């Protein structure tokens, strides 16, 4: 919200400044009345096709279709051979490297160059290249979990949308709203299957921080530091946006009204009172937990726990592979109330002003399955914990379908509006925790 308001204020200042310059003449207006002189200046028109325009305060959602959207693989390939044949991809997934050889075999004459980078590196390198006019990247692969890409990157002229119409026909439109998706993932709470052979010990988020009759925390908790993981911070922000659902989840679990114990007056911004999501953030920040940066070590901690000393950990869905690869006694906690988690979508972006615009779009089509879903591009990303979003692509890896796990779509608009405040609340309260 702070960022959007600042952008709008700056835009208003610019408009007022221009109006003041235009009205600086000392002559008095004609007595006959000139309607043109008294007309309000026309509202600025946006040139954006996707993203947030701070000049107009408008959001533009996908899917967006242009002349590129209807070009076939053959047409794009023919055009790609006439431009710079080196296609540079900045990716946050190392699995993207596996696409180089098969793509080049399928499209002789094109050279795919993949750089495996951190999320911040992908965006920062693209920004520096845009600012200096030395654009190397043609394609970016990353995910937007808190709305920063949608609200801050398209309007800088760094990215431009590409939605291939034939492929988008096989993807639910809700998953096309903010970007063009590669696949979806999410995080789960894990439990020890040996300690709880009858199934997951929790079915509600409030039970995670539950205390026993002696006032002791029921479960040892392991997680990455929430405030340093944007996807986790966004999840907690969603609880605040969905406070009614969080309150109902508490009442359904315990059969009584939720008592609000947090102090909203500790901050220099407005904190909603009697908000169940804020209450959960406060209580969670005061719980005893161990922060571990490595996901494999998180699930190992759960594997090593016992029924007498039970533990839960929050980790990415893909860490379930340790169940088979390492023999860990772990499983996901699914269908938690009010919802298990947020769907985080890995997305593909075309770089504006790149040297290989046709090649970039050909590769984006290829990596997301091509016209019939059988290009082979999705193969490296087909694993437990990744869910393809095409309805014509068979998911053989995951034990459950995406709609059977209790996750909800990520509402980036609402999360972006409060994300900085939620981060501040978490940091402040965590520093106050007696269990820190």
Predicted feature residues:
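C-terminal motif of bacterial Sec signal peptides marking the signal peptidase cleavage site
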Residues: 17-20
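Bacterial signal peptide processing site
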Residues: 22-25
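Conserved C-terminal helix/tail region of periplasmic/extracytoplasmic solute-binding proteins
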Residues: 44-56, 60-63, 69, 405-436
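Short, polar/charged alpha-helical segment
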Residues: 49, 73-81, 91-111, 189, ...
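Extracytoplasmic ligand-binding site segments that recognize negatively charged/polar headgroups
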Residues: 88-101, 113-125, 135-297
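Periplasmic-binding protein-like
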Residues: 169-172, 184-188, 280-284, 327-349
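Mature extracytoplasmic/periplasmic domains
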Residues: 341-415
